[in-house]
Amino acid sequence: MGKIKELQTSLANKIAAGEVVERPGSVVKELLENAIDAQATEINIEVEQSGVASIRVVDNGTGIHIDDLGLVFHRHATSKLDADDDLFHIRTLGFRGEALASISSVAKVTLSTCTDNEEGQQIYVENGEILDQKPAKAKRGTDILVESLFYNTPARLKYIKSLYTELGKITDIVNRMAMSHPDIRISLISDGKTIMKTNGSGRTNEVMSEIYGMKVAKDLVHISGDTSDYHLEGFVAKPEHSRSNKHYISIFINGRYIKNFLLNKAILEGYHTLLMIGRYPICYINIEMDPILVDVNVHPTKLEVRLSKEDQLFNLIVEKIREAFKDRILIPQNDMDKITKKNKVLDQFEQQKLDFEKKQQQENHSQPVNSHEEDEKNDDKAYHSSQTHYEPTDYILKEENNTSVSTSPNSDDDYTQTQKSVLYDLENENQSEFINEADFDSDISNHSDSDIKGSVSKDPSRRVPYMEVVGQVHGTYIIAQNENGMYMIDQHAAQERIKYEYFREKIGEVTNEIQNLLIPLTFHFSTDELMIINQHKEELDKVGVHLEPFGGNDYIVDSYPVWFPTAEAEEIIKDMIEYVLEHKKVNVKKIREDAAIMMSCKKSIKANHYLKNNEMADLVNQLRETEDPFTCPHGRPIIINFSNYELERLFKRTI
């Protein structure tokens, strides 16, 4: 007797729900997409217990015809596709016809709907089966209530994260939907508290202000561009608002939020040298294209897509982001509010430290003095170490046993405070990678400042204001002033930028001339590595790296192109071969870029190097003539401004 049998519909729906309905946020996403496809201009979302208890989505869209109610909870039943060819011309957010069937198989669903010319209807569904249908008073649109999510799949319920995390996921989904559809009024309410709401003005920057705050919103730069196949619109935040993960990069295609590694890479390339390693921008990018150029039918969640002509789109994004910042002043303003908050934290920490030391003195009064002094030194080290990676944040810091917010309906901060708390909980707090001045090589430059000055633009940029140098702090930071306030300049970062642009130009021409190595480099490759090297050996030859067989899986390199810096030639060759092994291609542009960064870093003045006033003034003038004077090649800021107003606030001259 055969063993294969067709699964029951309810079981098949539960299996399908495992891909479509992963968590409460998945339900919100699917219902939001349906509301948007129904041409709603207002959508209200209410959740209880972060969506685990209930999710309600109410819209004023076209509603569902009474004749369609019997099919709406069937798998693969949809109004958005008809013929095979429609799959290649999708302009709606939903199209698979799986969402409602999947949701109703793992939750209890009540749906009320009304079209323009019909009486309202209400149906109740459990386990994918319609148990009740009756006429009901309803406004035009659809009202869906999802209760007891995963009530019949306890294994799925077990893997639900904390309520705060789940609310964060929901908030994130609603935020992105609001960004991509600013013409729709959207609100999110959690346990009676308003988390976010938009006014449907049609302006994306207003929605971003609602999500990220006014400070970020006023530093958003609009970008726009076209190719024969793509139209790009978006907003990119200034580098000073960078974050510790990619969560704040929002990419949309025809209004659909997507995740794409190559497009993420294009955005980071557009910010090249403006962001530190491990830092990521806040940005919104929407790409309009013919649907035939994108395949959205890759995964049930519809987050992953396949694109045609990706290289063209990559170059467009890079170009427009670079243009956005090319002529802008990117000197970060010092934030007094953050300093005040930080000082409160430091004061509390210092008081705790003093109390602890006093207690230790009382308990160990018989201990020798030098032992106590040693402990005090260790405490100081621990204290300073704990503050080394302190990073001011725009988010509300969670306090133990105190996550409550104002519930007053008249409070402007009600929903923003809650949302910021949720976003803080959601964000991955990865430590940024910092450049340690002490680790830099102490070699000095072989090129004079006059040589370098001549290599950069002769037309001084107006982006760096003229300022008078007045001093230096710890042989590391230059202090300057003008009528707008005080400026602090990191001398190492400043010279690093100057020399980077000089070396980038110097090694920009790839020639066929070679220089012999005194001692050849030897490389041993595994069998699979050897196959990759042999495949790309011709490309390596073209850039002047000639690998010669040396027996078995060993190869030698005995020369290098003259455009390689002599001191770094060996390291560049090794990096190039490692790059080929990892990426299976040769990237000459990246090699030149890395070489310029390496040389500028090693040959710039270091911290604790005292300069004369005329040397500092000359350094500032050289910086003014560079193309990108605000960050070093690693993305660290070069200049920070303290306005006159901020200085007066520090000394309580103004409030």
Curated annotation (Swiss-Prot):
Gene3D superfamilies: 3.30.230.10, Histidine kinase-like ATPase, C-terminal domain (3.30.565.10), MutL, C-terminal domain, dimerisation subdomain (3.30.1540.20), MutL, C-terminal domain, regulatory subdomain (3.30.1370.100). One of its GO terms (cellular component) is mismatch repair complex. It comes from Staphylococcus saprophyticus subsp. saprophyticus (strain ATCC 15305 / DSM 20229 / NCIMB 8711 / NCTC 7292 / S-41). GO terms for biological process: mismatch repair. The gene is mutL. This is DNA mismatch repair protein MutL. Residues 371-383 have a biased composition (Basic and acidic residues). It comes from the Bacteria. This protein is involved in the repair of mismatches in DNA. It is required for dam-dependent methyl-directed DNA mismatch repair. May act as a 'molecular matchmaker', a protein that promotes the formation of a stable complex between two or more DNA-binding proteins in an ATP-dependent manner without itself being part of a final effector complex. PROSITE patterns: DNA_MISMATCH_REPAIR_1. Residues 357-416, 439-460 are annotated as: Disordered. One of its GO terms (molecular function) is ATP-dependent DNA damage sensor activity. Belongs to the DNA mismatch repair MutL/HexB family. Keywords: DNA damage, DNA repair. Residues 402-416 have a biased composition (Polar residues).
